[in-house]
Amino acid sequence: MARYIGPKCKLSRREGTDLFLKSGARALESKCNIETPPGVHGQRRGRLSDYGTQLREKQKVRRIYGVLERQFSGYYKEAASRKGATGENLLQLLECRLDNVVYRMGFGSTRAESRQLVSHKSITVNGQTVNIPSYQVKAGDVVAVREKCRNQLRIAQALELCAQRGRVEWVEVDADKKSGVFKNVPARSDLSADINENLIVELYSK
């Protein structure tokens, strides 16, 4: 299945919220009315059934992290097989993806750009080049930009944007060396309250 490459605004309008798919330097334009669904009948956001609400929440989270349907289903199965709350396990698995960690550290301005950095072999984990965006980063891992890629302007700009919005507490970054430590897997309380993972659990439990 191909990855979506269309307008980012359309996805945010579909979910009715900013999915942070664009960098801070190119935030959603004023003309992108996220309160209005896309399409010719966009003015009518119909009332959703319980199933529809659950499905929309799954799609929202899937799009935030840039994960395809089959991948997302695999993450859910892995989360359900682990001890603890399935929904929290799911979010933690998504947060530990290498492309997401690169984004959290500020090396990429968006998760899509961070995924590209990983795929283009611009990122190392514990000194070894890793080009798999879904690679699971573990607590204590050192994630860095490869030396030959450190002078890229987009990385410097991404780090500046990250410094402006504030970096998450579970990573520690040396912006000059373009290297960081994934200190720990974030707890549910550390993550966005705008996500209702219980709806996703209900959807997959049907």
From Swiss-Prot:
Occurrences of domain S4 RNA-binding (ranges): 96-157
GO CC terms in record: small ribosomal subunit
Pfam families listed in its UniProt record: Ribosomal_S4, S4
Record flagged with keyword Ribonucleoprotein: yes
Matches recorded under InterPro entries: Ribosomal_uS4, Ribosomal_uS4_bac-type, Ribosomal_uS4_CS, Ribosomal_uS4_N, S4_RNA-bd, S4_RNA-bd_sf
GO biological process: ribosomal small subunit biogenesis; translation
Function: One of the primary rRNA binding proteins, it binds directly to 16S rRNA where it nucleates assembly of the body of the 30S subunit. With S5 and S12 plays an important role in translational accuracy.
Membership in a protein family: Belongs to the universal ribosomal protein uS4 family.
Protein name per its UniProtKB record: Small ribosomal subunit protein uS4
Gene that encodes it: rpsD
